[in-house]
């Protein structure tokens, strides 16, 4: 039966409210993405790191045949993965000397802080486990939850590999960068040391050669 005028008006208003809400959520996500990039730009040694990690993680996801949705998710996660560092003081993040145990504990909180920052946005819910768990280790010695092996979400395992790789081929205040070939070789040599998923690491090295 045809809509009554008042019913139609109510439905239109509801749709407009939903559209406005979606636009606000999209804007909030854009703010977080922009904030993540801006956070790095303060430090010449990390500038561009997250964007590179996002792009290379997506490329690797394609290489191993993950679905398009997961390719898009891991690219976004790569850009945002260190957003939690906004809650860590610059005097700790940019310290060139040896970190104290307390400072290390502060830095290790960035994964949990990042998850909390992104949690209110439904559109980012799929990447929350990647943000929280990208510093877990295959042997269970990582943080924040000490997950082991396949308990760690596959996209967090991917990000862990790519994050380390980009750090190795980029300049840092405490060391010079190494070549892509040397970084891939070094990671392959350390594949059984317990940091990464050894099968995924082999695939990554294969892609980089």
Say what each PLM segment does:
Residues 2-12:
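C-terminal output helix
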Residues 4, 30, 179:
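Residue-level recognition of oxygen-bearing side chains
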Residues 8, 15-16, 35, 93, ...:
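Generic leucine side-chain signal with a strong bias for well-ordered alpha-helical environments
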Residues 13-26:
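The C-terminal output helix
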Residues 24-34:
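Signal-transmission linkers at sensory-effector interfaces
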Residues 33-36, 45:
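Surface-exposed, interaction-prone regions with an acidic/low-complexity signature
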Residues 40-209:
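Metal-dependent catalytic cores of enzymes that make or break cyclic nucleotides
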């Amino acid at each position: 039966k045809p809509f009554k005028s008042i019913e139609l008006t109510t439905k239109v208003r509801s749709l407009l409210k939903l559209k406005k809400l979606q636009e606000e959520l999209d804007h909030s996500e854009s703010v977080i993405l922009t904030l993540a990039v801006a956070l790095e730009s303060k430090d010449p040694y990390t500038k561009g790191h997250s964007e590179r990690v996002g792009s290379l993680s997506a490329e690797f996801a394609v290489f191993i045949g993950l679905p398009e949705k997961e390719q898009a998710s891991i690219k976004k996660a790569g850009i945002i993965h260190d957003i939690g560092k906004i809650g860590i003081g610059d005097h700790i993040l940019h310290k060139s000397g040896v970190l104290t145990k307390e400072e290390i504990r502060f830095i290790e909180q960035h994964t949990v802080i990042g998850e909390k920052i992104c949690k209110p946005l439904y559109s980012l819910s799929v990447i929350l486990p990647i943000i929280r768990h990208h510093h877990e280790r295959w042997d269970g010695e990582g943080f924040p939850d000490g997950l082991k092996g396949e308990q760690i979400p596959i996209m967090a395992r991917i990000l862990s590999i790519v994050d380390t790789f980009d750090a190795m081929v980029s300049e840092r205040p405490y060391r010079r960068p190494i070549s892509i070939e040397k970084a891939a070789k070094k990671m392959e040599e350390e594949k059984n040391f317990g940091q990464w998923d050894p099968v995924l690491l082999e695939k990554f090295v294969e892609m980089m050669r």
